[in-house]
Amino acid sequence: MQQDIEIERQFRLLRPASEIIAEAAGNGSLLLSYEIHQSYLPDTGKWTIRARKTIFGGRMAPTFEQTLKCRGEGIARTEVPINLDANGYSRLARQCGPVLRKRRTEISLGDRIWEIDVFLNPALLGLEIVEVELPSEDASLVLPDWVGEETTHLPQYRNAELAKRLPADEESQ
């Protein structure tokens, strides 16, 4: 089983995501845009267990994944991704809570890939976050002018916490 250390920082946006994405499309830095549906198993202690479906809008088949993510503080977390087929994903997703839906757009700036997430659930409309993965915890980072407050250390911005705020009747797959 592959185990990764994810080193990531997260921020609010100072400008609407639509403006940033349009600018990136115009200057050639826009890489990819796709939709993510993810849900979480009820609290399991040390690990957060996520079911994720990534939808590429007809450009390629959806992908399915189960991820175990170690809870903790700081910007580095152990992550264990497990590829699933559609049936495995459906079985896992039925055990999970409400589905968090977001559109992710990847933008290349310098030597970093910035991932802008626009949340699609009615309860989260207006929430727009950007994440960037780093090669090490002490890696330098030049922030674009559209990056605002850092939310890395604020638990209420973690996807698993956002999913808890969704109504129970949100679709389960």
Question: What is each residue range found by the language model?
Answer:
Residues 1-173:
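Phosphate-end processing signature that detects enzymes handling 5′-triphosphorylated RNA
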